[in-house]
Amino acid sequence: MNMMRTAMLLAFMTALFMGVGFLIGGKGGMMIALLIAAGMNLFSYWNSDKMVLSAYRAREIDEANAPEFFHMIRDLSQNAGLPMPKVYIYDSPQPNAFATGRNPENAAVAASTGLLERLTPEEVAGVMAHELAHVQNRDTLTMTITATLAGAISMLGNFAFFFGGNRENNNNPLGFIGVLVAMIVAPLAAMLVQMAISRTREYSADRRGAEICGNPLWLASALQKISGMAQQIHNDDAERNPATAHMFIINPLSGERMDNLFSTHPNTENRVAALHAMAQEFSPRASTPPPSGDRPVRKSGSVPTTGWRRGNENERKGPWS
């Protein structure tokens, strides 16, 4: 299903590229756009994860320089039955996180310094388990390719005027009106694609993430905190790269106050409600209290060690059980 969804996404993005090319330069422009789209699809498959990590200036960490956070990811990955992903931290006061990579064998998870400093260990575990769920569900390929191509399509639409705005351009079958259509429709269509693939996968990743970390209430508490802080703390890199907004656990853009229909993410209250309902199904872990909101904020960028008990390997354990 995920491979089919990815193929349909690539086909739509390619068709959109060709359509904009046709509006700008007729059949010749359409063929050039097809070649560009094919090249970008191939490039995105192999390199889009590197581009996203580079855009946020994320730095890879290991057991030596961030042992506690690294160990937590290792334990959560083992609980999910996943290979150990590469682990990154990027500098941003806004608490948030994302996952990227073309498959579980070539995956990476990234957390902001704000996430590690402002959330409790249990909440961090819930967030990173959510990101690992995206890796396990193979959402990361779709997310990274969408971010790359949506940004390129928006750029092509924004520059359509300069490439095809000449009223005397005989290669443009629809003239100046066609260019205006390309400028408006292309970025909008790219945004709609991002919304379409984002909504249901977030609920699925929430549920699987709660299973991985062992307690839905940890993730629910994290979502509430991140959602509130995202409106108050700007993420400058995300503002410069809005096409990547759908990759984060909570939309990082400061202007995200749209309703459910036009949001890149499901409504946070709905996600939290679903997790609380899920907590009632969890046994015996449903009685585990949510993380304390009055715990002092940590000054370092590390997360306390998981303390995962190994006594019974068949029993699912959360990293702070």
UniProtKB/Swiss-Prot annotation:
The chain crosses the membrane at residues 6-26, 28-48, 145-165, 173-193. One of its GO terms (cellular component) is plasma membrane. One of its GO terms (biological process) is proteolysis. It holds the Pfam family Peptidase_M48. One of its GO terms (molecular function) is zinc ion binding. Coiled coil: none annotated. Keywords: Cell inner membrane, Cell membrane, Hydrolase, Membrane, Metal-binding, Metalloprotease, Protease, Transmembrane, Transmembrane helix, Zinc. Zn(2+) binds at H130, H134, E202. It is found in: Cell inner membrane. Residues 281-321 are annotated as: Disordered. Residues 310-321 have a biased composition (Basic and acidic residues). Its EC number is 3.4.24.-. This is Protease HtpX homolog.
